[in-house]
Structures are given as structure tokens and as C-alpha cells.
Amino acid sequence: MQEDKSNATEWIMDTGCTSHMTGDRSLLMEQTLRPPTKDHIVFADKSSRKVLGLGRVAISRDRHMENVILVESLGYNLMSISMLCDLDMLVIFGKF
């Protein structure tokens, strides 16, 4: 995965992503991260990045995502569709 130097504030809904991920520490609600469950994330292109910890991210005033992985030098925010479906959330795709 190529590094994107932009400070992304939008989330990409990813059907191939198994966890919510960000590279932006400022998005996490906690000052102290929870310990990661794995050391590295391997992407589809076989590149890998170091996992720095886990936290929560607010997506609105009253909603947040749990167990968001903070990934070193990740220039994207990835929202896992499979994690949303595991929470019985309905995800609908369509044309604009």
C-alpha cells in the first residue's frame, strides 16, 4: 500500500479490510492506546506496516467505532464493512 501524505479526515469503506484502521493518532478519543493484538498489518499488495495500538474514533456526536487500529504511516482511514455487518449494521451501496 502506498503512503498518502495527506492528512485524511474522510473514511474509505473497504470490503476487503478486516478491521477499522487509521494512521492519524489525533482521530483517536483516548490519550492512551490499548495494546495491539498483532504487531503488523499485511495489505493486499503484501506490504506491511507496524501496528501502534487500538482505540476508539468518534464518527458523530453519539456514535463511535471501537477497536480502531492505529497503523504507522497509514495515509488513509479504512472502515471495515465486515466489522459493520458483524454489528448487524446495514450497508447499502448504490449509484450517485
Feature locations, PLM:
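Anionic group-binding determinants
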Residues: 1-96
